[in-house]
Amino acid sequence: EIYLIITAIMWSSGGLLIKLLPDLNGFVINGLRSVVALLVLFIIGGRFPKFNKTIICAGVAHGLCATFFVVANKYTTSANAIVMQNTAPIILLIITAISTRKLPKLAEILILLSAFVGIILIFFDQIGGGNLIGNILGILAGVSFATMFYFNGKKDADAHSSSMLGFFLSFIIGIPFYFSIETFGMSEILPLLGLGIFQLGIPYLFFSIGVKLTTPTTASIIALIEAILNPVWVFVFVGEAPGVFGIIGFFIVIVAVVVKILYDRKSVEKIEISQENI
């Protein structure tokens, strides 16, 4: 579990480091941090990515998620962006229901409605044009994040390969925007290196180790440390904070996600017990 805790803490630095790059376009930030992370995975991971349909789909979802999240941070608060991304378990419920053509259970529907209440409060908190765009991008990051989990959960998936593909796609998406860079000194290079090495590259290596040593439920809950710490770092060092409705919505969504994770664990345990009794 220590690997996952370290991963979540390192992930949580993303919002702060992005805010330290006010003069760079979000697409530029994401593209350049991703190419650094790609090099880290390749050098330390020591292998080329595998390719199949599932890995490509997961990789595309990963690249889109990273892009939406970074650009969202340019338009809304880090708290809003990160909590929208972490609606992934809730959104995954919808994706699963559509793919299996089965309605969610009543308890799942109640969890879903609770999460939507939190999301509405976040939108209501900062409804200005820029913030609205940021919140929408945050939701799209959540959809992409959930899609990535969906494909990485398949038998022929390979999270290491899809991560490398996602980082490469993020770099490609940023190409049209690299020409807009006006200033690029140490004040830009250091945060970008921090994002690529300490916020993306190394944490993904720790995550790949830690996720094998614990249950998916524990991993999911520990990962929420990122959602809580991310806005804390930004508030402490930059002074950015959401409004009252945003804070209330933030905690409603976090609680809904935790309840959903624990509900999934309980459902799996019931299935395992019933199979043992057969």
Where on the chain are the PLM-derived regions?
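Specific transmembrane alpha-helical segments of multi-pass solute transporters/efflux pumps
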Residues: S13, G45-N80, M84-Q85, V117-L121, ...
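Helix-helix packing/entry segments at the starts of transmembrane helices
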Residues: L32, A81-T87, N152-L169, L200-V236
